[in-house]
């Protein structure tokens, strides 16, 4: 066993600490995986590897929420969040999901130095005026994880509101989080618009990358801004080859690794 893997008694102690210090409805199974409850649904984490081309292995994993019943997935993220019709319910659900993700990732991950990628709901960004990420930072402090180990994925819909996008990036960055923004196809000057608030990572789908007329110029503009390029939703060998040829930094997609409720190895990119 890797020396960085936490022993069951350590996880138990930390889980009890979380229960005593928060009002999250959490539970753990016999394998020490933590789940939560929202509107009678059991919420679980699944993780998809994000690969670093230069390292040839995972540099992190993207976390997604699912609702499970009788061992089967019954609700997908958009269905789960649709249950939160009120802003206060949305805030509660979002914080619960992040707590579940962070607990599972850092309690069960054999390589705790890898980054955790977490999504943020666009409605949450609009309903929380300031101090984005403060509640999550408090939870990370509780379990002993630095915010610099977490990548906040800003939803692509926020690109339509530049004022909000700049405000959100500044908020999260001030707390030490890494920021991943999505490239907007057809908006070539968006990096310039962000001014000095360049994200750490720019995400683009494999399909959108292939559709670019001048891929080298796009990639150069991202790298010149000091950001790394992550190509996601890689499903085919052609998309994979295009991402490699484009000089992308990070890769993610079902071709490389399916989302699953397990973190067992530091996957190697050359297995593809």
What feature does the model see in each segment?
Residues 168-182, 218-231:
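Short beta-strand/loop segments at the ligand-binding rim of alpha/beta enzyme cores
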Residues 126-141, 161-168, 187-201, 243:
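Distinct, well-ordered alpha-helical segments
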Residues 69, 118, 183, 243:
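Signature for phosphate-centric chemistry
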Residues 19-81:
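Active-site core of bacterial EAL-family cyclic-dinucleotide phosphodiesterase domains
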Residues 72-75, 85-91:
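Extended, compositionally biased accessory segments flanking or bridging domains
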Residues 1-29, 33-37, 42, 157, ...:
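EAL-family c-di-GMP phosphodiesterase catalytic domain
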Residues 44, 60, 115-119, 147-153, ...:
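Structural preference for beta-strand elements that scaffold enzyme active sites
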Residues 94-162:
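Catalytic core of bacterial c-di-GMP phosphodiesterases, primarily the EAL and HD-GYP domains
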């Amino acid at each position: 066993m890797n020396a960085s893997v936490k022993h069951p008694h350590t996880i138990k102690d930390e889980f009890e600490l979380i229960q005593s210090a928060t009002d999250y409805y959490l539970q753990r199974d016999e394998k020490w995986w933590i789940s939560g409850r929202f509107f009678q649904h059991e919420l679980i984490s699944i993780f998809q590897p994000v690969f670093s081309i230069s390292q040839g292995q995972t540099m992190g994993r993207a976390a997604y929420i699912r609702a499970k019943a009788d061992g089967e997935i019954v609700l997908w993220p958009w269905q789960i969040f649709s249950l939160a019709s009120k802003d206060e319910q949305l805030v509660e659900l979002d914080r619960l999901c992040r707590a579940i993700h962070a607990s599972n990732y850092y309690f069960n991950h054999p390589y705790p130095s890898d980054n955790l990628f977490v999504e943020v709901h666009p409605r949450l960004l609009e309903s929380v005026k300031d101090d984005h990420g403060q509640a999550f930072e408090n939870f990370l402090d509780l379990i002993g994880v630095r915010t610099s180990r977490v990548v906040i994925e800003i939803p692509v819909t926020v690109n339509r509101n530049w004022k909000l996008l700049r405000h959100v990036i500044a908020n999260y960055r001030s707390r030490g989080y890494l920021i991943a923004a999505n490239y907007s196809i057809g908006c070539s000057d968006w990096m310039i618009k962000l001014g000095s608030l360049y994200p750490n990572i720019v995400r683009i789908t494999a399909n959108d990358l292939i559709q670019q007329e001048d891929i080298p110029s796009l990639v150069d503009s991202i790298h010149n801004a000091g950001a790394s390029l992550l190509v996601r939703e890689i499903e085919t060998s052609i998309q994979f080859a295009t991402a490699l040829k484009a000089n992308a930094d990070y890769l993610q997609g079902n071709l490389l690794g399916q989302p699953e409720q397990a973190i067992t190895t530091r996957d190697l990119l050359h297995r593809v």
